[in-house]
């Protein structure tokens, strides 16, 4: 207990022993600790193993070539995005590893990333795969759930809490992690002019994100939710957290095209050029002013200096996603059915049909698994009850007629 105005003997909040000639007590903010407990805490911290990243020297950080090679094992296509992200991640962690070095007193600023691409193009997968290669904590946040402080919804600090939780409570490790903020385009302000009214889920959220993206010491409620007076807070330094923001930015290509073309209205050749180039405009010509016109505030654009546009996945890309990556969807289901002694076979036309369905549904790679799950439902229900070796063949007819009740997904024959 703490001494108030009287002469009460102080007690250590950790061991409970009283202050005497040999045991000295230090107090502050409602707690106290003795010199013996301080020594024990120091020993614990000395013996505690630092994270892999904390031990990683500049020479041990994977090079951009190594990072891209790792991405190639799990992500199909998006070659430009892989190269840009590999360089950005390498430079970021090289900066983190070298912060203790005084390089001509030059302060290297953080280069966060903005990914622009349609739904299902691989934005989240790219960020997650890189975090796995770097062996750092990773958290995903949905920008549409965030609101300005004081309004119903999530505070931006809750993003940091997710990262700390994914680091098993290790704040120091979380401070070297990666955060992916999805749907960043959905919090664009209503116009490029400064708002005179509250926009708590748009411009207000962008303003709230500024500090943590740039780098600050944020106070995070350990249990989540809103901050309360006298509440204990986690102090998280975001200076070394890499932020990757992503969004579809529907309509941005039109803004870019209008600026690039000298004659956007009428029947001139420039209009045809815009239609033919499509997403190529996003790769080559998008500038910060285009993003401002879309609705991002200039300050947040300045804190996302690395911008890259992802391609819409083609039918061939989607087909390759089904079979080529190390954790491809078809490989996963083959392993799953093998546990029930079932040999799973997809013919080439079936793979094409599944890819076409994903294109028709405009879900990209994200929709592939749900399509295959629906195809496999009856087979997964029946297979465990069937004894002996079995084979399941998925043909184009199965894919295109899977909604018909008369279609049987399991085709049996003697092995």
From Swiss-Prot:
Gene3D superfamilies hit by this protein: 1.10.8.60, ClpX chaperone, C4-type zinc finger domain, P-loop containing nucleotide triphosphate hydrolases
* Domain ClpX-type ZB: residue ranges: 1-53
In which residues is Zn(2+) bound?
A: 12, 15, 34, 37
* Keywords attached to this entry: ATP-binding, Chaperone, Metal-binding, Nucleotide-binding, Zinc
Quote the record's binding site residues for ATP: 118-125
One GO CC term, this protein: HslUV protease complex
Q: Say if the entry is tagged with keyword Zinc.
A: yes
Listed GO MF terms: ATP binding; ATP hydrolysis activity; ATP-dependent protein folding chaperone; protein dimerization activity; unfolded protein binding; zinc ion binding
Quote the SMART domains the UniProt record gives.
Answer: AAA (SM00382), ClpB_D2-small (SM01086), zf-C4_ClpX (SM00994)
| Keyword Nucleotide-binding set for record | yes
Q: Which Pfam families match?
A: AAA_2, ClpB_D2-small, zf-C4_ClpX
- Any GO BP annotation: proteolysis involved in protein catabolic process
Q: What does this protein do?
A: ATP-dependent specificity component of the Clp protease. It directs the protease to specific substrates. Can perform chaperone functions in the absence of ClpP.
Q: What is this protein called?
A: ATP-dependent Clp protease ATP-binding subunit ClpX
